[in-house]
Amino acid sequence: QYTDETVQNNSLVVECGERSRFIGYDDIYVQEANMYSYSYSTSFDGEGAITSAIDYVTTEDLPQLYVLEGHGEKDLPENFKEQIEKENIETNTLSLLNVDAIPEEADVILIYEPSSDLSEEEVDMLYQYAEDGGKLLVMAGPTQDGTLENLYGLLENYGVETCEGIVVEAVSYTHLTL
């Protein structure tokens, strides 16, 4: 009734009205592997998980994140998706090729590592969305053909400049893996 996940001992269900959120034991006690020392560390995140669940079941209008598709975008990493869910943000996909306008309920448009450039029409729609107060989150890297000219042109309107280069973390065990 509450979840499709496998229910374990010491798991919780938070319910209010028509909404419910299942909190698995693994969400309360989080285990992380350290590949350098071949050890595991366990931390308690019960407060965060329960607070998030209460917020979810009591909030009527959850923020809407639209993930752009249609340009060979990569899938969002699992830990990124989990964090979005924990923050009670609903995700949807959006192809600007099939719509005349960006949905009004879109709080944020996420552009995640496109492998091909956006069309001028798509950039115009995103520009109008941003000018009307919409939020854009762009995560782009190198592409096969080497350029995202239209996308980067959109970002330049807001003071974002791109340059070629490589970012290197000198201490390899302190980086975040996405």
Where do the PLM segments sit?
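Short, surface-exposed patches at the edges or C-terminal ends of soluble domains, predominantly
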Residues: Q1-L176
